[in-house]
Amino acid sequence: MAEKKLNGTVIVTYRCNARCTMCNRYKAPSRPEEELSIETIKKLPKMYFTNITGGEPFIRQDLKDIVRELYKKSDRIVISTNGFFTDRIIDLCEEFPNVGIRISIEGLQHTNDTIRGLENGYNRGYATLKKLVELKHPDVGFGMTVQDLNAPDLVPLYKISDELGMEFATASLHNSFYFVEAKNIIRDRPMVAKNFEDLVNELLRSNSPKKWFRAYFNHGLINYIYGQPRLLPCDMAF
């Protein structure tokens, strides 16, 4: 019988250098001694795919050790980050050239820095993306959590990703236990939906079947913000 593997998310810290408007995690950070240890990570099961997230993962000074240990049990690893710690990210990618990097950018410069409460956050994140492209890192992309404030930046950010030749992922504003926030809500749903429609049309103009699938996914997000059933059901925990 084939060995059963999982897809998993490893939250390596609840510390974060950003102050995002949709996330209060920075108000309740973990203490370093509370965070997952290397010994605990060694006990994790085999996985097809592992997402390393936080908090901001690159706050952990031993992140390389964590990645090294997870590669013993995971076929693919992607790290979610705000991209602020450029030197640390590049250093890790040079040692682990197959690791995926996904940088969260919440809009163009003013919008991103307003939402993230992180001075120079956009410039630092974009500089990290550019550096990874220059180094020809094979698995890099960025994405945004769409809300009222940044919806008009959806298509401009997609065009930046297209120029850089990288993945562009989207999510709709939502609540989560690790956000320590339960009041996130999209208020101008028609406006946000219209910007999603514009993105869908841009994606469908592509010759890439993968972008056509992303168009379908983003169409599903319109359903989601109107409280309708998801087109792609979530099967986590099943």
What are the residue ranges of the model-derived segments?
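Generic low-polarity alpha-helical segments
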Residues: 40-43, 234-238
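Conserved alpha-helical substructure of the radical SAM core
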Residues: 1-99, 177, 188-195, 199
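Radical SAM enzyme [4Fe-4S]-AdoMet core and its adjacent flexible, acidic
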Residues: 34, 69, 73, 99-106, ...
